[in-house]
Regions:
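Short, basic, low-complexity termini and linkers enriched in Ser/Thr/Gly/Pro
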Residues: 1-10, 554-557
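Acidic/His-enriched low-complexity segments
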Residues: 33-284, 407, 424
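Bacterial N-terminal signal peptides
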Residues: 21-30
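Long, ordered, helix-rich scaffold segments
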Residues: 406-408, 412, 441-445, 459-544, ...
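Positively charged n-region of N-terminal signal peptides that target proteins for export
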Residues: 12, 17-20
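Composition- and surface-driven signal marking solvent-exposed, interaction-prone regions
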Residues: 88, 152-153, 205-208, 342-343, ...
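Hydrophobic alpha-helical and helix-loop surface patches within well-folded domains
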Residues: 17, 72, 103-106, 220, ...
Length: 679
């Protein structure tokens, strides 16, 4: 055989073997998933116990004029119950035609019906299956108001020249743009063909080719099986910059260089996580910086994290977002919550991993600051939540799963894992986590499955240590156990001392040594300042103005004898001997540090929140600009809530919201509509 011929045959053989390995991998994953007992998912109409979707082939035309996706979804199915129909989740989809086939060709029309719509769940699409049907083809289009899509005019983008569209599928919004089994219990592989205006680029949570020509016709393949909420699409005027051998960033041309500089440590983060928890199993890890209306800080879409531009601080101080979304490549994407009441399995693990990544890349001090801020966030949330919403294994029956997205699954979940780490030792707990990710890789699991694995592979090894961790209290009870870890930061102690000196009049604001402060130190400084208390705060936090948990609550809540409760968002971290912050002192800080005009989103948010409470009017124009220019729910919801506490504030909030509402994502609109009782 000639060398050239041998090389061609070798390449063919290699390609064939790769495809066989991929097929075997998908079959193994499918078999493993089917072997797990199905948990009831109250947020899906689908029936995967009878008919399970294995693979999707998607084909869309993207119409910016009509604000719709129009095309076809072909579903490859496994018939576990030959008598059962296929039931899919939809929300405001226009179903034109449904066909079935035994072979993937020669499709014939089959009967289908769309059931009555529910405000939260959408409507079931029930499809009658012929005896030998293995493929279902659905011709459909989306609605211009689809909750999982946002269509942006050029004026809403950084470049101001081209429109932009992006999806947000978590928790149950995939059904608004794809007819599918919209439950995290079902994992699918997929391909897609996307046609767009020729000058725009389409990217997906799939294999993206960084150097693909912008020709308006794009093809994608996702070989790893993912749940529906991790299917993602974006279309816009995008450029790419490489960050490392398998990492990069997409963004609008006027943003991409700034984003590349901000995220330049991404490859280091991937390597650090692999050293801790095993190989990265998704091929490439890229980021996409979206326009500012994106409702979240980030979304962990596999292979392509969607990120808010509000983290582009210029000093890498907010890249904990990257660490968080990267960590999801292990916790959430690799091992997934089976239902949305198990959400803490995604987010609590991810916050814990995020801080371990930050420590590995930036040092222990950074981790300590992030953990201390996280504990503060958790305590603030616990001050306002009902007991039923303080539970990790939360009951969301009859509720929108987005309602479970407080700091509880994130910070309480991470604190529970920190408790396990501190009790059993970091080295032992790291080995446990690595084995956990390997054991449940590419599966969706319940809280009970995790607890069984925890008992068998960690707790039972040392009953005396296990007795120190009240697992049931962490998982099923409100509040925080009394022996929970209490993360502290020596850097924050120094910040508090400077705040005290200024408030006591020992130094002027301009003399506070802030030159080397990080964003985290600035945020802690502002949070530690004593603010006037509103009525709601007094109800929850009578007599407690320290940074420690209140021993008991007055008013509507009573502390359980075995747990700590929380102080309110307005509390300070200083002692009672300092004065309450007022308009004059706000003005002094503003003059010294120009906080009203801060371009750092975290600092600006905290300052504006304080300005509303103190009625610091010089910040009001910036407040309006902030609320109109970004749609990140983490920032805008608390600001509207604070405004709505007074009649004049609510009037201001409504005036701003009238301007901002058309630019917000549907997820943010739903949240603010509720805050302001918008009609």
């Amino acid at each position: 055989m000639e060398p050239e011929t041998r090389n061609r045959d070798r390449l063919k053989y290699t390609s064939l073997m790769k495809n066989l390995v991929l097929l075997l991998f998908i079959l193994c994953v499918a078999t493993t998933v089917d072997s797990q007992p199905a948990a009831k998912d109250f947020h899906s109409y689908s029936n995967p116990q009878d008919v399970r979707v294995r693979h999707l082939d998607l084909d869309w035309d993207v119409s910016f004029d009509k604000k719709i996706l129009q095309g076809v979804a072909v579903l490859t199915i496994a018939r576990l119950n030959k008598q059962a129909p296929l039931i899919l989740d939809t929300r405001h989809l226009n179903i034109d035609k449904v066909e079935a086939s035994a072979t993937g060709s020669g499709y014939a029309a089959t009967k289908f019906s769309v059931g009555q719509a529910d405000a939260i769940l959408g409507a079931p699409l029930t499809i009658q299956l012929p005896d030998n049907a293995k493929f279902v083809r659905i011709t459909y289009s989306t609605n211009p108001d689809a909750s999982g899509l946002q269509w942006l005019a050029p004026a809403q983008t950084a470049g101001k020249k081209n429109p932009f569209m992006f999806t947000q599928s978590e928790a149950i919004h995939a059904r608004s743009w794809i007819p599918l089994q919209d439950t995290p219990q079902v994992r699918v592989t997929y391909t897609a063909r996307v046609r767009t205006p020729r000058n725009l680029l389409a990217v997906m949570s799939a294999e993206n080719e960084p150097n693909t020509p912008h020709d308006g016709d794009y093809s994608f393949r996702m070989p790893q099986a993912v749940p529906s909420y991790l299917i993602a699409l974006a279309v816009g005027d995008l450029s790419f910059r490489s960050l490392g051998r398998r990492t990069g960033v997409y963004a609008e041309p006027v943003v991409v260089d700034k984003a590349a500089n901000e995220f330049s440590d991404t490859e280091k983060m991937v390597e650090a996580t692999e050293r801790l928890y095993g190989p990265y199993r998704w091929g490439r890890y890229d980021l996409l910086v979206l326009p500012p209306s994106f409702p979240y800080g980030g979304m962990e879409n596999p292979r392509l994290t969607f990120a808010t531009p509000t983290v582009l601080a210029g000093d890498k101080s907010l890249v904990s977002l990257v660490a968080h979304e990267l960590a999801h490549s292990w916790s959430g994407n690799l091992v997934t919550n089976a239902t949305w009441r198990d959400f803490w399995l995604n987010e609590g693990f991810t916050v814990y991993l995020e801080r371990r990544i930050l420590e590995a890349v930036y040092g222990r001090s950074r981790e300590e600051m992030e953990a201390a801020l996280g504990l503060r966030d958790l305590r603030d949330d616990l001050a306002r939540l009902e007991d039923k919403d303080e539970i990790l294994h939360i009951d969301l029956t009859g509720r929108d799963p987005d309602e479970g997205s407080s700091d509880v699954p994130y910070e309480k979940g991470a604190l529970f894992l920190r408790h396990l780490e501190q009790t059993f030792g970091r080295s032992r707990f790291d080995r446990f986590l690595r084995s956990y990710f390997d054991h449940f890789a590419f599966q969706s699991i319940t809280t009970d499955q995790f607890l069984d694995y925890l008992k068998t592979n960690l707790l039972n090894e040392n009953p005396s240590l296990a007795a120190q961790v009240p697992v049931d209290e962490w998982i099923n009870q409100p509040g925080i156990p009394r022996n929970a870890p209490n993360p502290t930061s020596s850097a924050f102690s120094k910040v508090e001392e400077q705040a005290k000196r200024w408030l006591r009049g020992e130094i002027s604001a301009s003399a506070i040594p802030t030159a080397k402060w990080t964003t985290q130190e600035w945020v802690h400084f502002l949070r530690s300042l004593p603010l006037p208390r509103d009525k709601a705060e007094t109800q929850f936090n009578t007599g407690n103005t320290t940074g420690t948990p209140a021993a008991s609550d007055a008013g509507s809540r009573t502390a359980s004898p075995n747990r700590t409760t929380a102080t309110s968002p307005g509390r300070n971290d200083l002692d009672n001997s300092v004065v309450v912050l007022d308009h004059q002192r706000m003005a002094e800080l503003d003059q010294a540090f120009h906080l009203t005009q801060s371009e750092n989103s975290e600092i600006a948010f905290q300052w504006l929140l304080m300005s509303i409470r103190i009625r610091y009017e010089p910040a009001y124009p910036r407040l309006e600009e902030f609320l109109v220019s970004i749609g990140r729910r983490k920032f805008i919801k608390p600001l509207y809530e604070e405004l709505a506490k007074t009649p004049e504030g609510k009037e201001r909030a409504l005036a701003i919201y009238r301007r901002a509402r058309p630019t917000y994502h549907p997820i943010s609109v739903a949240a603010i509509d509720e805050v302001l009782k918008w009609k």
